[in-house]
Amino acid sequence: DTPGLTIAALRTRARRLKRRHGIGLVVVDYLQLLQGSGRQSDGNRVQEISEISRGLKTLAKELNVPVLALSQLSRAVESRDDKRPQLSDLRESGSIEQDAAMVLLLFREEYYILSREPKRPIEGDDVKVYDDHAKWAAELDRVAGISELIVAKQRHGSTGKVRLHFEAKFTKFSDLADESQRYDDD
C-alpha cells in the first residue's frame, strides 16, 4: 500500500514476508503504480513497464509463488463497438502480454448497456420512445448480473470465456447457478 513503490523495494518486501510468514501469493494493485529502477533516462514509460513486468516474473520464480498483477486498460476499448477487452488493450502492454503466464480480463456488458439508457418514456411520448426503451430494457435483462472472465492467454492451457454471476452491491463474482451457461470456447 505504498505509492510509487519501486520493483526493487517490492522485491525486498516480498522476500522478507516470504521468510517471516511464508506467503503463498503476491498481489500488485496495480502494475502502473509501480516504478522501475529509474535507469530509464529518457522517461519511456513503456520501457519502464517492461522492466517492472520482467521484475515481477523474476520475483514469482525466485519466491516460487504466483504474482497476480492487476493492470489498467488503455482507452482504446472505449472507441470500439465491441467493448470486450483484448490483450492489446492492456495499457503499455507489450511486455505484460509477453511475460505473463496467464492473462485474465473481466467484461461486464451490463456496464455498457446501462450507460446507453434511452429517454424514459412519459405519457404522451411517441410509440418509438416506448419501443426504444423496451428494447433497451430487454437487452439489459439479458445480461443483468452476468460477467465474463476472458482467459486471453494461458501459457500451459486453453483460452476461452467463463460466464460468472456478478453481484454489484458487493463487487462479488461467483459461479452461475446454471452450469450449462458457464463456458464459451472461442
Feature-to-residue mapping (PLM):
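Flexible beta-alpha connector loops of hexameric P-loop NTPases
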Residues: 1-4, 35-50, 77-88
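C-terminal regions of RecA-like/P-loop NTPase motor modules
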Residues: 5-25, 54-63, 76-186
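Helical hairpin unit composed of two closely spaced alpha helices linked by a short loop
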Residues: 23-69
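Short, ordered loop/turn segments at secondary-structure junctions
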Residues: 30-31, 72-73, 108-109
